[in-house]
Amino acid sequence: MSKGQVSVEFIVLFLALLVAVVVSTMTPGIFGLNKSVELSSASLAHAALSKVKSNIEILSVSGEGSYKLVYVKSPPANWTFENRTIRVYGNGFNISTNTSVDLNTYNYLASSLKILSVNLTRNDKNVTVAIQ
């Protein structure tokens, strides 16, 4: 291996790193900061909804009176629980899912990015949801 080959490989690696940095910093500029914030909020809401749903499904096979406390990070959004549907919607996103168990009707408005405490209680025929 000659000295020239090492420096060529170094230059190629350096240019690849430079291209990666330029592309990653261009993304908010191309799509706009607002679009990037919407995508981040939607992703966060999807993760929170998925965590709540999986805990509801686990609780649905538990005995009556079982209780779970779930903490999720939520973007500014409206949370709606109705029949077997959970819906989270906010600025630029609308995500919903269905569960295998009935839910009590409950609405909650998260006015800012915060950690929600979701209280889940298994009743005789449904799961009661309360958010604090």
From Swiss-Prot:
It comes from the Archaea. Disulfide bonds: none annotated. The keyword Hydrolase does not apply. The N-terminus is probably cleaved by the prepilin peptidase EppA, which recognizes the class III signal sequence. GO terms for cellular component: cell surface; extracellular region. A motif (QXSXEXXXL) lies at residues 9-19. It is found in: Secreted; Cell surface; Fimbrium. Its main location: secreted. Residues 1-4 form a propeptide. Disruption phenotype: Deletion of the gene leads to completely nonpiliated cells. InterPro entries: Class3_signal_pept_motif. Keywords: Fimbrium, Secreted. Pfam families: Class_IIIsignal. Contains an amino terminal motif QXSXEXXXL, which is part of a class III signal sequence. Minor component of the type IV-like pili. Essential for pili formation. This is Minor structural pilin EpdB. It comes from Methanococcus maripaludis (strain DSM 14266 / JCM 13030 / NBRC 101832 / S2 / LL). The gene is epdB.
